[in-house]
Amino acid sequence: MTSQVNAVPTDSLAARLARPELLSLEPYQSARRIGGSGEIWVNANESPFNRTGIDGANRYPECQPPGLIAAYAAYAGVAAHELVCGRGADEAIELLIRTFCVPGQDSIGIFSPTYGMYAISAATFNVAVNTLPLAEDFSLPDDISALTGSKLVFVCNPNNPTGTLLPLGEIARVAKTFPNALVVVDEAYIEFAHNADGSPAQSATSLMAEFENLVILRTLSKAFGLAGARCGFLLAKPSVCELVMRVIAPYPVPVPVSVIAEKALSVMGIAQMRADVVLLNKQGARLALALTEAGLSVLPSGGNYVLAFSNDVEVLARALTKAGIVARRYSHPRLKDAIRISYASEQQTDSIIEAIGRIDSK
């Protein structure tokens, strides 16, 4: 017996915004979704042989591994049915565009400069991109109404690559300004962010009960140190999650990834992550100070990186390259004099600071 498609309330914002054909779409019913009970499993054309030593590697995984979903829901403070797991936050970006944007008709909105995959993902699906420049200090402009009409409005917080952290009041302002759009808050770096008083920055999950149009993206790539595992999460109202589940691939979370991710989300794993964040933020402060003392202008950062500006940034770029250090430059006009350097280990930071010390940007 196949599992039933969960109904999406027709009066929900998600139903009004979704691509019309998805409201009646019967998603692919994989063998794992159909389920069943028994001793011998021959319903999915799998191999009976497991030659890897990894338990379950020869079997298709659950689309949404229950243990992983429960672990991240507990960590994020949301209900399990308000969560979708996929191959990093990048997949969540694509899933949202595929679910809610009609190619050649709809558009997304972004505040620039920001993470490039919002625009790239939209372009690959023939979805237009409405762009609004950030203010001079890279905060949100006072008037953001120019993005009205966008189906999805992306807000990277902390912003990549500037590191700018928006207060929750600004996130609420965006949600209020665009009641007929989904406001997607990308919190890939939220674990690194702190308020001016040193307290941890509050996640926009605290606004989910108030705003039906709020979607939050999270990842295990940054603070949890699992970039190679590709595991991310979409947090939203159940109606949004249900529609996204109609377009997601049958098996987005490989068995080894699920095992690694659940371990990272254990009590010990979370404690280790928080300890790592403290260490990395300490090295980031050292890095920012060294750059400032070398005459560069460094933006306050809520991420695990610093963005530094110099009229002769090429001098620093060459010094880093000569020392075998690979940093990030940008082609965006507002970032042509900038370089982004990720936080590193103490020993690596020593090497970066040594390379910075060889330049004179003053």
From Swiss-Prot:
Question: What Enzyme Commission number(s) does the record list for this chain?
Answer: 2.6.1.9
Q: Pfam families this protein is in?
A: Aminotran_1_2
Which residues, renumbered to this chain, carry the PTM N6-(pyridoxal phosphate)lysine?
A: K222
Q: Which UniProt keywords apply?
A: Amino-acid biosynthesis, Aminotransferase, Histidine biosynthesis, Pyridoxal phosphate, Transferase
**What biological process terms from GO does the record include?**
L-histidine biosynthetic process
InterPro entries, per the entry: Aminotrans_II_pyridoxalP_BS, Aminotransferase_I/II_large, HisP_aminotrans, PyrdxlP-dep_Trfase, PyrdxlP-dep_Trfase_major, PyrdxlP-dep_Trfase_small
**Metabolic or biological pathway:** Amino-acid biosynthesis; L-histidine biosynthesis; L-histidine from 5-phospho-alpha-D-ribose 1-diphosphate: step 7/9
Named cofactor requirement(s): pyridoxal 5'-phosphate
Classification via Gene3D superfamilies:
Aspartate Aminotransferase, domain 1, Type I PLP-dependent aspartate aminotransferase-like (Major domain)
A GO molecular-function descriptor: histidinol-phosphate transaminase activity
User: What's its catalytic activity?
Assistant: L-histidinol phosphate + 2-oxoglutarate = 3-(imidazol-4-yl)-2-oxopropyl phosphate + L-glutamate
Q: Which domain of life is it from?
A: Bacteria
CDD domains attached here?
Answer: AAT_like (cd00609)
Family stated for the protein in its record: Belongs to the class-II pyridoxal-phosphate-dependent aminotransferase family. Histidinol-phosphate aminotransferase subfamily.
Q: Which PANTHER family match?
A: HISTIDINOL-PHOSPHATE AMINOTRANSFERASE, HISTIDINOL-PHOSPHATE AMINOTRANSFERASE-RELATED
Q: What is this protein called?
A: Histidinol-phosphate aminotransferase
Taxonomic classification: Bacteria, Pseudomonadati, Pseudomonadota, Gammaproteobacteria, Alteromonadales
